[in-house]
Amino acid sequence: MARGALALRLLVLLALLGLEAADEAPKVEVYARSRAEEGKENTLHCFVTGFHPPKIDIELLKNGEPIPDVKYGDLSFNEKWQFQRLVYAPFTPTRGDIFACRVAHSTMTEPQIYRW
């Protein structure tokens, strides 16, 4: 019984702390793991930080279409309850192709596209 009461108190505390967090729009960085060379495989990263609430949609795009084999890092947060997430996928830079990250969050009126 005491263990259940402690767990309930902890959940209430976490909920109250979460209520203090203001809605925050994400900050987005799109970059390659290493220096990009045309025709050489690399890893495209989309690092999204500073957002709240935690629900967010992040997609990597090649010429406007989703890139396959995307990996999602763990969702983590800081002391202000602002969240961050890394999304990445292998890609090969080629002339004429456009690589980007599309982010949709409740603080945005519509999804935003951030080009690499």
Q: Which role does the model predict for each range below?
A:
Residues M1-W116:
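Terminal anchoring/processing modules of extracellular glycoproteins
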